[in-house]
Amino acid sequence: DSLYITAGERGEGMIAQDPTKHPGSIIRIHLDGKIPRDNPKFQDKKNWLPEIFQIGVRNPQGMDLSPFDNKIYLTNHGAKGGDWFGEAKFAENYGWKILGWGGTNYTGSKIGPKWKPGFTKAIKYWVPSIAASSMVIYKGKEFKEWNGDALITSLKDQSLRKIKFKGNNFINEKIIFKGLIGRIRDIEIQESTGIIFLLTDQGSIWKLQK
């Protein structure tokens, strides 16, 4: 009964550390637009906007609710490197722009450490950047051996990747294909069959099945 919304930091960097502003945050509201009374502000984050669920993201791209553990997962663009896949976590901070997630500014100058205690740690980082875009937690019959894995598309890398993970622990990554159909913008799973559909920047829709 909740709606999760992501907001990029619009090139403003440290604004993602300001919980009184929306850029660089994850927002949680009810479907009727009301604010959940168990959001961070009503717990121990008194200075946060009441609708903010988490701060410190840069440019979120894909987001999905896992049908296996009922958690929210997302992909996020770093700068020059530092894309990541991770879990949206209540009242936590992914660290942008205190952390660089392994990447640098586009000028090549350093940003900050990849991660340090006190901040949310992503499940998987990519350096150099793959320009991670959409994602889903796969559930279906067509590729039942993938159930519970994250399927992540990319723009620059033009790939479809499968991430196996448990909790917040990365297990392995497999590139399903790369450079075959162009920049992949979106991914959807047909619920009744588990067949995968991919949308490219060229406006083409591709179907992936056995």
Task: Enumerate the predicted regions with their spans.
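Beta-propeller domain segments
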Residues: E9-K174, G182, K210
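Blade-level signature of beta-propeller repeat domains, shared across WD40, Kelch, NHL, RCC1
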Residues: D186-K210
